[in-house]
Curated annotation (Swiss-Prot):
Its main location: cytoplasm. Coiled coil: none annotated. One of its GO terms (biological process) is translation. Keywords: Cytoplasm, Ribonucleoprotein, Ribosomal protein, RNA-binding, rRNA-binding. This is Large ribosomal subunit protein uL14. The keyword Ubl conjugation does not apply.
Length: 138
């Protein structure tokens, strides 16, 4: 039996940034280039409401573009960048140039060996194994 990944943090007061069927970039070297969000782990919403996800949330993605070995497969991923501005507790507003995810294994370790581009500090605090591969934490 596989261990359950503990998802930490509160979702209260978050802006709906990425939802079902959002197309995102893959920010690691696992073989995928573009992915589509098809599920949000830990989302407890209202019937028929479209689930949404934000920075540092774990989502289920389907790889749409990439190497033939990973295309048309489903993976778990963590959102590390989002275009929609969000507010930090100190009052600053942060937004990135693109929406990006890092593909992870079922045990929570990154599938790739490097992360391209910056990642958000919220994702680095919640997922330290991803932060160890990142070149820049904003």
């Amino acid at each position: 039996m596989s261990e359950k990944i503990q998802v930490l943090g509160s979702r209260k007061g978050l802006t709906p940034a990425l939802q079902h069927y959002s197309v995102v970039n893959v920010a690691d070297n696992s073989g995928g280039k573009e992915a589509m969000i098809i599920g949000v782990y830990g989302y407890r919403g209202v019937l028929r409401r479209v689930p949404f996800a934000n920075i540092a949330d774990m989502v289920m993605v389907s790889i749409k573009k990439g190497t033939p070995e990973v295309r048309k497969q489903k993976f778990r991923a963590v959102i590390v960048r989002q275009r929609m501005p969000y507010r930090r507790p100190d009052g600053t507003w942060i937004s990135f140039e693109d929406n990006a995810v890092v593909i992870i294994n079922p045990d929570g370790t990154p599938k790739g060996t490097e992360v391209r581009g910056p990642i958000a500090r919220e994702a680095a605090e919640r997922w330290p194994k991803i932060a160890s591969l990142a070149t820049l934490v904003v």
